[in-house]
Amino acid sequence: MNILQTNNMKNEQTYRFGKEEELFHQTILHANNTPAYGLFDGEMGITLVLSDYVRARKRRPIKTAINVLLDNILSNLHKNMPLDFANGLTGIGWGVEYLIQKGFQKGVGVEMCEAIDAKLMEVNLRRVHDLSLETGIEGWLHYIMAHVQGAKLQRREAFEKGFLAECMDVCHQILLEGKADKALLSLSNKMIHILKGEDTPYSFHLGQFIQ
């Protein structure tokens, strides 16, 4: 490889990273204009992706912007927001736990998600027929597991015992019927082990929710 080829490669790499930087700065600038705050298609999803980017590229100015985004999300939560995992409260709560447990953000999960938990515990899980990830039981289980794990790590307790017992009953019923998809069956089994106090870690996989 000659010097000219090497210089061309360096120029291409500089241009590529420049475009990448430009893209992420534009994302930050327009994030507050996003009409939704949720995980799949809103500000929380943007915040998590940017957080991973900050860690990979070590960009402190962007980290400050991420803190502003998270503050904006949490300050705009209200009781009329849906509990949906895709674009509602439980997805936002999952995002909060992601940021704390991955070391992106300081804070106490049970305090930051107190309003989310209160609304979720109003639901009679046994009467919920929607098993989907986006708007139903599967998504809620992701949040509940992440939240219970986060609380345990911080020596706190998430949710009332009666609610967790109800959650376990629902998971047992899902496994007993065996009609759910493989993802929900696996999730229900893991939920039962976690609620029994067994050492079964919940793993965060952002890529399965945000493409």
Put a short name on every predicted segment.
Residues 2-211:
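Glycan-recognition and catalytic cores of secretory/periplasmic carbohydrate-active enzymes
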